[in-house]
Amino acid sequence: MLNNKSILITGGTGSLGKELTKTILKKWPNVQRLVIYSRDEQKQYQMAQEFPESEYPAIRYFIGDVRDLERLKRAFNGIDYVIHAAAMKHVHIAEYNPDECVKTNIGGAENVIKACLSSNVTKVVALSTDKACAPINLYGATKLTSDKLFIAANNIKGKQDIKFSVVRYGNVMG
C-alpha cells in the first residue's frame, strides 16, 4: 500500500506522528520517502537520533508550520499521501490561547487542503478526535471545523484525483 510511495506527516514529531513513523517504517520498508514535517527543531533533532537517515534512507526532516501555506506547498512537492497530524491538542492551552488554536487547527487545515490541491497528492488523511463529536470546548470545536473542511474538500477538488478522509480517535495512551 505505501511501498514506493512518498508520504508526508504534518506534526510528524508529535506523539501520533512518531508512532505513525514507526509503523510505516516497519510495515512498509520500501517506502520511497517519508517526510517528517513539524515546526519544532529540537523534536526533529531528537527524532533524527531515533530514526537516523543512515538507517532509514527514506526519511527526511522538514521544518515548517501548517500556518505557512508557501512552506507547505514546497514540502508537498513530489508527495503522494499526506497524513495531517499537526494540531494544538491540549484543551486547557487552547482555552487560554484561542487565537493560536484557531490559526493552527482551522487555518492549518485550510492550508493543508490548499497545498494538497496545488500539488499531485492523491490521498489525505486528517487525524481528528472524539472531542469533535458534540464539542464542549474550543479544541473540539476547532477539530470539528477542521473535519468538515477536509470532507468538504472532496466537493471542491473538481476532476483532480485526490481523496480527503478524516479519522477520529479517543484518548491515546502510551
In which residue ranges do the predicted regions lie?
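Residues in the short beta-alpha loop(s) of Rossmann-like NAD(P)-binding domains
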Residues: 40, 50, 130
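Adenine-nucleotide cofactor-binding loop residues
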Residues: 42, 67, 89
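Short, conserved SAM-binding/catalytic segment
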Residues: 47-56
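Conserved Rossmann-fold NAD(P)-dependent oxidoreductase catalytic core, especially the SDR/UDP-sugar
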Residues: 81-84, 88-148, 152-154, 162-165
